[in-house]
């Protein structure tokens, strides 16, 4: 159940909610709202802090009941850590800590006052917007396939944010909706979230919002366009491919921003079958597609004054007697031929045709997003996405957007010196580059299909989902991409 968000202008002590959320630092210093409650209660918070019953350490939460002079029956004190080190990551963690502490139980409504706490190099609008996004992320529950285990609706349902910037609140709600949309798609099992399902979801959303439209290409239409690379990957699956094209038209005659997202709804590896574990997590191989759709949802709900096109090649990489093989030579939509060195390097084979298709929209910028390589995860871990581009201005825009919302990317080189690693004797290009620099050679491969474009590639293999049996889709980098689009709209 998604949280409902409002703004609050009243003093915390008189707010009629089930719980107030305030903060304390490691040295027992209280935030302004906490100081007001302390004064109203006759110094109760300060006394608790001094005797060690109220911790200001990062991650600590203390729930207090029935403070005198305070209307709300509960006060949640969230530890903020050292005041001198309090910044963006600490603020976002505090939001999540608060919501997780109230996620289940008797509290239905709360007032979050930490949005009034100063965060270095960030303004009040940022604090409100990011509080909404982080709170909604922490409150997310997956219930689609739980059946008899379906979670109940108990727990926090309404969160008032201290502040008065209605636009920031609305933008936060829009981006939070996009993140949640992407996470839900990513978390669905592959027998639910097929290429056809992704297409249906896109059509349904576009049909519900003025200014949005959807076009779905089936395999026959893709064949007519010459998408031999994408269709080769699709050959082994009973779930037939789709090309999902979503358009948001709110920027007049301006050129659109185009996002392309890898939509491999399940990846067996093909003939090069995955044998080293982790195959059960390959439903997340469509998170690039899910996340660009989520970004589309955010842009539409925020009514951003720009034109946006999202292209998702939705394909399942499976195995049957018709599956493509290592050493096959396939012809892409661009006319370039590709020698298949490994059928488990399939993401780039569907993206190359999608990138060629996307150029018909004459993009102001073209960005592809993909869980493309394990090599990127080895290099950068789960903390950051990999970014590759030959366009410094575009790369810097994306990097800055990621830093702004703590959904970060790290730039990797895309030098011409790597390109010979993709040489083939039998085709124009080989689809793998060998043992070394795997994330970079994958980016180099894609760059051959984005020539003449202001293009960037985001490898999100390390950030798209959490690891392990209880891991879930994260929705990254919807935050980065949405902030980038907000920045572009502000400059228009």
From Swiss-Prot:
Binds 2 manganese ions per subunit. Belongs to the peptidase M17 family. GO terms for biological process: proteolysis. It comes from the Bacteria. One of its GO terms (cellular component) is cytoplasm. Presumably involved in the processing and regular turnover of intracellular proteins. Catalyzes the removal of unsubstituted N-terminal amino acids from various peptides. Its cofactor is Mn(2+). It catalyses: Release of an N-terminal amino acid, Xaa-|-Yaa-, in which Xaa is preferably Leu, but may be other amino acids including Pro although not Arg or Lys, and Yaa may be Pro. Amino acid amides and methyl esters are also readily hydrolyzed, but rates on arylamides are exceedingly low; Release of an N-terminal amino acid, preferentially leucine, but not glutamic or aspartic acids. Its main location: cytoplasm. InterPro entries: Leucine_aapep/pepB (IPR011356), Macro_dom-like (IPR043472), Peptidase_M17_C (IPR000819), Peptidase_M17_leu_NH2_pept (IPR023042), Peptidase_M17_N (IPR008283). Its EC number is 3.4.11.1, 3.4.11.10. This is Probable cytosol aminopeptidase. Keywords: Aminopeptidase, Cytoplasm, Hydrolase, Manganese, Metal-binding, Protease. PROSITE patterns: CYTOSOL_AP. It is an enzyme of class 3 (hydrolase). The active site is at residues 274, 348. It comes from Stenotrophomonas maltophilia (strain R551-3). One of its GO terms (molecular function) is metalloaminopeptidase activity. Mn(2+) 1 binds at residues 267, 344, 346. It is found in: Cytoplasm. Pfam families: Peptidase_M17 (PF00883), Peptidase_M17_N (PF02789). The keyword Signal does not apply. Mn(2+) 2 binds at residues 262, 267, 285, 346.
């Amino acid at each position: 159940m998604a949280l409902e968000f409002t703004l609050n202008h009243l003093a915390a002590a008189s707010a009629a909610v089930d719980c107030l959320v305030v903060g304390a630092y490691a040295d027992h210093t209280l935030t302004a709202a906490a100081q007001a409650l302390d004064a109203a209660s006759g110094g109760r918070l300060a006394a608790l802090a001094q005797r060690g019953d109220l911790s200001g350490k990062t991650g600590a939460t203390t729930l207090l009941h029935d403070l005198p002079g305070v209307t709300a029956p509960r006060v949640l004190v969230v530890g903020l850590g050292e005041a001198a080190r309090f910044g963006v990551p600490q603020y976002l963690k505090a939001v999540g800590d608060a919501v997780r502490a109230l996620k289940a139980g008797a509290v239905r409504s709360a007032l979050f006052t930490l949005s009034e706490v100063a965060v270095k190099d960030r303004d009040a609008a940022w604090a409100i917007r990011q509080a909404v996004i982080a709170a909604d992320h922490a409150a997310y529950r997956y219930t689609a396939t739980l059946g008899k285990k379906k979670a109940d609706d108990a727990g926090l349902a309404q969160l008032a944010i201290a502040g008065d910037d209605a636009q920031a609140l609305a933008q936060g709600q829009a981006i939070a909706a996009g993140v949640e949309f992407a996470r839900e798609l990513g978390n669905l099992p592959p027998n639910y979230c097929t290429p056809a399902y992704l297409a249906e979801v896109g059509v349904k959303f576009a049909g519900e919002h003025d200014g949005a439209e959807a076009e779905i290409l089936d395999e026959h239409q893709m064949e007519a366009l010459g998408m031999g690379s994408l269709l080769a990957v699709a050959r082994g699956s009973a779930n037939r491919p789709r090309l999902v094209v979503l358009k948001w038209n709110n920027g007049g005659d301006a050129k659109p921003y185009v996002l392309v997202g890898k939509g491999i709804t399940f990846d067996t590896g093909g003939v090069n079958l995955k044998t080293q574990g982790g195959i059960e997590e390959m439903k997340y191989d469509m998170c690039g597609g899910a996340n660009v759709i989520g970004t589309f949802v955010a842009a539409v709900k925020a009514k951003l004054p720009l034109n946006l096109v999202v292209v998702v090649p939705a394909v399942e990489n499976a195995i049957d007697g018709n599956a493509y093989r290592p050493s096959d030579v396939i012809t892409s939509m661009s006319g370039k031929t590709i020698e298949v060195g490994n059928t488990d390097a399939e993401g780039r084979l569907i993206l190359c045709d999608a990138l060629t298709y996307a150029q018909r929209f004459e993009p102001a910028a073209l960005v592809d997003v993909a869980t493309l390589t394990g090599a990127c995860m080895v290099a950068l871990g789960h903390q950051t996405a990999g970014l590759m581009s030959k366009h410094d201005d575009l790369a810097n825009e994306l990097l800055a957007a990621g830093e702004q919302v703590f959904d970060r990317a790290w730039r990797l080189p895309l030098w011409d010196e790597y390109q010979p690693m993709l040489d083939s004797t039998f085709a124009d290009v080989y689809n793998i580059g060998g043992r070394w620099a795997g994330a970079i050679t994958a980016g180099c491969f894609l760059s051959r299909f984005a020539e003449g474009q202001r293009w960037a590639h985001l490898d999100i293999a390390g950030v798209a989902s959490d690891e392990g049996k209880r891991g879930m889709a994260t929705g990254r980098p919807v935050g980065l991409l949405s902030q980038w689009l907000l920045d572009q709209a502000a400059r228009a």
